[in-house]
Amino acid sequence: MRLILLGAPGAGKGTQAGFIKDKFNIPQISTGDMLRAAVKAGTPLGIAAKKIMDEGGLVSDDIIIGLVKDRLKEADCAKGYLFDGFPRTIPQADAMKEAGVAIDYVLEIDVPDEAIVERMSGRRVHPASGRTYHVKFNPPKVAGKDDLTGEELIQRDDDKEETVKKRLSVYHEQTEVLVGYYNQWAASGQPGAPKYRKIAGVGPVDQIRDSAFAALAG
């Protein structure tokens, strides 16, 4: 099972990716995770990427493709893989094609912008553990405090409302074109063309998971 998850930032791709990778026993290749690890380690790549992400921009194709190519060489990708947050642009999608990266399915998770702004701007994180809360959907027992340690929660820079809206604008301008790109490729009947599936990403998490599994079964 080799697939790409498409959808706006905050559409729930990461959550559904977790369910899919467990069901099919494949690694989730998240450029966000790879970038955050680089930021945390303070590598030159990480420092450059943090500045771009904090401003709501997209990290350059060269940086991302370099990370992805290295990742696909690892042994756990032999049976398949799940891309979450990649490709984000037509040049990245073309680079994947040229590199011979096989894709069986492209799954789009569709969520309205207003729902995404509410989801993301309400996130709060405990920096030391990575535990995540939401002021409305999953609040801590004490407002602004981690349940286990009582330490302060923070709002990540890329979860602030202004940044979320900018990221959505960037998504609509640069990444949404991939919906058409993969739809056309899927409809072309060309050898190696993936199947394209679209599901609604609003509602109970389990319901969205079941929709995703059903989409990947046909």
Swiss-Prot record:
It is found in: Cytoplasm. Residues 30-59 are annotated as: NMP. Keywords: ATP-binding, Cytoplasm, Kinase, Nucleotide biosynthesis, Nucleotide-binding, Transferase. Catalyzes the reversible transfer of the terminal phosphate group between ATP and AMP. Plays an important role in cellular energy homeostasis and in adenine nucleotide metabolism. It comes from Janthinobacterium sp. (strain Marseille) (Minibacterium massiliensis). Pathway: Purine metabolism; AMP biosynthesis via salvage pathway; AMP from ADP: step 1/1. SUPFAM superfamilies: P-loop containing nucleoside triphosphate hydrolases. Gene3D superfamilies: P-loop containing nucleotide triphosphate hydrolases (3.40.50.300). This is Adenylate kinase. Pfam families: ADK, ADK_lid. Its EC number is 2.7.4.3. The lineage of its organism: Bacteria, Pseudomonadati, Pseudomonadota, Betaproteobacteria, Burkholderiales. One of its GO terms (molecular function) is adenylate kinase activity. ATP binds at G10, A11, G12, K13, G14, T15, R123, T132, Y133, G203. One of its GO terms (cellular component) is cytoplasm. AMP binds at T31, R36, G57, L58, V59, G85, F86, P87, R88, Q92, R156, R167. Residues 122-159 are annotated as: LID. Belongs to the adenylate kinase family. It comes from the Bacteria. Coiled coil: none annotated. One of its GO terms (biological process) is AMP salvage. Monomer. Consists of three domains, a large central CORE domain and two small peripheral domains, NMPbind and LID, which undergo movements during catalysis. The LID domain closes over the site of phosphoryl transfer upon ATP binding. Assembling and dissambling the active center during each catalytic cycle provides an effective means to prevent ATP hydrolysis.
